[in-house]
């Protein structure tokens, strides 16, 4: 039996809590200083590794003791991992660096079933962990004493006030343009959640802007990428996907394509380059470009949808937008999700009350959870598209092994795997056999509680607005009934708006969303710009032509807001809908925007009663 080294590290909290400090993540308000003290006891005859297979940390967070278990991520690299950069004179330099004894770990908090951790132990402890639903970051402090570490909540990192950042994907239907429309398609049963094992061999390309940003420090760039993939690998475990980094290319001399702010153009160019150049020099399943370019509008990432294994389209582009590694990792995970056939989440998609990773806007803090909808779409993608390239594990690795009950990976023949019996936190699962207990009715869902259906009448989805209707469990299913809402056209918000698909869209809230709390709706004269009929100001686009708004429709075109500094402020994006007045918005007394026209509310909704979102 192979003996595994167990290391215990006691973290002593420094006598004070800091109020503000500048760290790699940015300016941090409220942090704790800790000193890791490593105590190791090697079993007799054990071989010393630079980085142990497993480690355990005991420390306090907010005065409460926690135990953090870490396990080396042995699926992070393929054994034949290689990387390429370019010399100052343009020569290609390709190496196969040793990666077996690396320093990247996944982990969990003892007695917290929903906890996660992604940690680098290369030079101190650096990364993030989720504790009791809150995200914490940890990193070494750059004092003369190298043992000092800062631990702080993600929410305590100061962030610039700006419009929300979002994915640039606007068409997320299947290639046949036939979206999944039935609610039953978005119900993920316990059986469906036992996804088959899949492997994504990932190639990452780093553009020259990032090299410049890090002053040519390739070692620092590598560490940034390795931690990105460590987090991505951890997130995709919930879909039983192993993401292994097989190749890294750093454009240290110059970019190989024209990386530009037009995200659709950059995505197209990168796809062409991947097909014609990259695939010929390194086998892989999916390629992601990481860049410092500021894409047009609020876009921070874009990818082709349902494209995994396609020679050109199995790609994505990601802006290296944040100094927090977790944020960039989540963006790349999101774009890879599109490659796997997962569209953006709609209003009916849930993650147990937490934000979801496939929301079109990145949440704060960023989510590591796939929604019920995402899981159903991924399952459908596997069934309908049958992507062949992700069937096989990365070559020359020991990642593929016979099923092992207790390794927390769902493998062939297992119904569940919650770890060893002493560490299992999942009561539905018999840890000794990796089978579900015979009394289990459900494993997950809004109406599933401790493996049994919730009592009929238990509210499972609260009303989001006065236009929405709360839903309750039936007592016969783990899933919350399909979302329902009040009839479209019903007055709301004291007659400032009319209900539309469960919401009360008004311009004031749309301005708040785009430009922050100081913004309000602009004066009427600003909306007259929509009569111009150019690429910025219009009502509709037909046959590549911008159709100007008629006078009565000007408040159904581009949205104008007054943010004090600019009285006719607007937002432009490649997305035809972004920055436009939302459908269903009140444009005059008794009228709403419908198909970019200001029409009578009764005429707009004459055939509707109660709708359900899908």
From Swiss-Prot:
Residues 402-488 form the Disintegrin domain. A motif (D/ECD-tripeptide) lies at residues 466-468. Its EC number is 3.4.24.-. It is an enzyme of class 3 (hydrolase). The modification Pyrrolidone carboxylic acid is found at residue 192. Its cofactor is Zn(2+). It comes from the Eukaryota. InterPro entries: ADAM_Cys-rich, Disintegrin_CS, Disintegrin_dom, Disintegrin_dom_sf, MetalloPept_cat_dom_sf, Peptidase_M12B, Peptidase_M12B_N, Reprolysin_adamalysin. Expressed by the venom gland. The active site is at residue 335. GO terms for cellular component: extracellular region; plasma membrane. Pfam families: ADAM_CR, Disintegrin, Pep_M12B_propep, Reprolysin. Keywords: Calcium, Cell adhesion impairing toxin, Disulfide bond, Glycoprotein, Hemorrhagic toxin, Hemostasis impairing toxin, Hydrolase, Metal-binding, Metalloprotease, Platelet aggregation inhibiting toxin, Protease, Pyrrolidone carboxylic acid, Secreted, Signal, Toxin, Zinc, Zymogen. This is Zinc metalloproteinase-disintegrin-like HR1b.
